[in-house]
């Protein structure tokens, strides 16, 4: 974890935003881009962009900017997206279905490789071509498929128990959609995607 702690989480969270924009530039055949152009389109201070990228190396040329293809390649390497990353999803409800189907649509190298649910009526059925398995098969499947990331979309009361099972199986990163706080060891990174809380904070700005 030491090498990761040198880079702030805020920087790491901005890298995928840069990557998404740069990937768009590739699609429209733009070959170079300046930090000013990136900042204007992403609403991020250009100096912050330069500082973020400089934390990982010297990727730009003064007066020219960044080579789009090269920067995409480097950011993907930094985020460890050059190889296939397998993800487990726990909770095959409406949200779990939506995430699985969207992931299949993306056709990216980060793919959902296993889906689990404790409802016997769902087990054996497929979502985006992936069979839903019982939670009793979670640890064995995660180990066998070498899955390191997981998504939790279960109800709040079940989230911590699921988190415990995932970390016991060797999961190193969890994206939690359950509207509750979960805890794991220091070697497990947890991110939250609480739609309700985000909407509530937006409501504050209503006039």
Curated annotation (Swiss-Prot):
Name its cellular compartments.
Cytoplasm
For this protein, the record's PANTHER family field holds: REDOX-SENSING TRANSCRIPTIONAL REPRESSOR REX, REDOX-SENSING TRANSCRIPTIONAL REPRESSOR REX 1
For this protein, the DNA-binding region equals 17-56
Q: Can you quote a single GO CC term?
A: cytoplasm
* Cross-referenced SMART domains: CoA_binding
Q: Which SUPFAM superfamilies match?
A: NAD(P)-binding Rossmann-fold domains, Winged helix' DNA-binding domain
Function of the molecule: Modulates transcription in response to changes in cellular NADH/NAD(+) redox state.
**Oligomer status and interactors:** Homodimer.
Binding of NAD(+) occurs at: 91-96
What's the protein here called?
Redox-sensing transcriptional repressor Rex
NCBIfam families, A to Z: PRK05472.1-3, PRK05472.2-2, PRK05472.2-3, PRK05472.2-4, PRK05472.2-5
Pfam families, per this entry? Answer: CoA_binding, Put_DNA-bind_N
Q: Which InterPro entries match?
A: CoA-bd, NAD(P)-bd_dom_sf, Rex_DNA-bd_C_dom, Tscrpt_rep_Rex, WH-like_DNA-bd_sf, WH_DNA-bd_sf
GO BP:
negative regulation of DNA-templated transcription; response to redox state
Give yes or no: UniProt keyword Disulfide bond: no
Q: Which UniProt keywords apply?
A: Cytoplasm, DNA-binding, NAD, Repressor, Transcription, Transcription regulation
Q: What is the lineage of its organism?
A: Bacteria, Bacillati, Bacillota, Bacilli, Bacillales
- Which family does the entry's similarity section mention? Belongs to the transcriptional regulatory Rex family.
Origin superkingdom: Bacteria
């Amino acid at each position: 974890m030491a090498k990761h702690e040198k880079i702030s989480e805020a920087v790491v969270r901005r890298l995928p935003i840069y990557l998404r924009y740069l990937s768009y530039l590739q699609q429209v055949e733009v070959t170079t881009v300046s930090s000013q152009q990136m900042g204007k389109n992403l609403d991020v201070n250009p100096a912050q962009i330069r500082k973020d990228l400089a934390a990982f190396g010297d990727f730009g040329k003064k007066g020219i900017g960044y080579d789009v293809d090269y920067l995409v390649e480097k950011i993907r390497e930094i985020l460890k997206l050059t190889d296939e990353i397998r993800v487990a999803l726990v909770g095959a409800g409406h949200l779990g279905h939506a995430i699985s189907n969207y992931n299949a649509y993306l056709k990216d190298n980060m793919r959902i490789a296993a889906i689990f649910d404790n409802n016997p009526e769902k087990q054996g059925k497929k979502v985006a071509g992936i069979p839903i398995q019982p939670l009793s098969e979670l640890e064995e499947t995660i180990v066998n498929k070498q899955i390191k990331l997981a998504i939790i979309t279960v109800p709040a009361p079940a989230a911590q128990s699921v988190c415990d099972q995932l970390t016991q199986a060797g999961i190193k990163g969890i994206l939690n959609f359950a509207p509750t706080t979960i805890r794991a060891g220091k070697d497990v990174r947890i991110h939250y995607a609480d739609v309700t809380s985000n909407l509530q904070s937006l409501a504050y700005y209503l006039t």
